Amino acid sequence: MHPRFQTAFAQLADNLQSALEPILADKYFPALLTGEQVSSLKSATGLDEDALAFALLPLAAACARTPLSNFNVGAIARGVSGTWYFGANMEFIGATMQQTVHAEQSAISHAWLSGEKALAAITVNYTPCGHCRQFMNELNSGLDLRIHLPGREAHALRDYLPDAFGPKDLEIKTLLMDEQDHGYALTGDALSQAAIAAANRSHMPYSKSPSGVALECKDGRIFSGSYAENAAFNPTLPPLQGALILLNLKGYDYPDIQRAVLAEKADAPLIQWDATSATLKALGCHNIDRVLLA
């Protein structure tokens, strides 16, 4: 079991501990539960889906990286496939506040970058901030997404974001988590190709500036993040954050990164290079390359 889970795990009910122990035994537990695993946990504990998601939130929050706030938020995004995806907030010393990742963004990106097609619900241990409510409104589940909070009845996103402004106001038809492929040829080594593939999946209807980041760890594992724009612009999630979300949730740490590649267009209206390289250097990675989409 990864050390970060030990405290939260010890506080779970005995029957949930017993059912989870073989799942969490792997140090690199992928921070997700398949539909089959969810069903098994429900049978072992007698909990329904909502109660089980609440019970698991401390494990999601244990994935948080909060050196600034020490305020750990956990989220569980429930995919329509039946898979549940953990998420947690992340803060980066030496970078800027704007590079911060919120727990809801983490769980949603985890699902999206894992190939999930849509979300049915999201469970969070604290009420979503306005930034996250706006981020969620970019999803193809839209205002119907169910939000579950401890001690409250579940409500749709529309109840938390009345009179919402979103992609439909800008006549955007392709939404976040819809399948997208921008068709750039995969060239270069494996890490470059992973970055280009991530750029091909970008959701960037507003700037038309595709980008993707791929991180290679010392053991050869590669984590890729795609750019995810938002109708309100500021809640946009950069591609580096997508890759860092996966790296963190899968049990790796920043010193494990040995090389990074950013893929983007040289003449794009928005350029990720400066922010990406600055944040990576703050995390200790100086081996950073840029490949140009053509």
From Swiss-Prot:
Substrate binds at N89, M90, E91. Residues 48-168, 186-294 form the CMP/dCMP-type deaminase domain. GO terms for biological process: cytidine deamination. Keywords: Hydrolase, Metal-binding, Zinc. Disulfide bonds: none annotated. Gene3D superfamilies: Cytidine Deaminase, domain 2. Its EC number is 3.5.4.5. Binds 1 zinc ion. HAMAP family: Cyt_deam. PANTHER family: CYTIDINE DEAMINASE (PTHR11644:SF2). This is Cytidine deaminase. It comes from Escherichia coli O1:K1 / APEC.
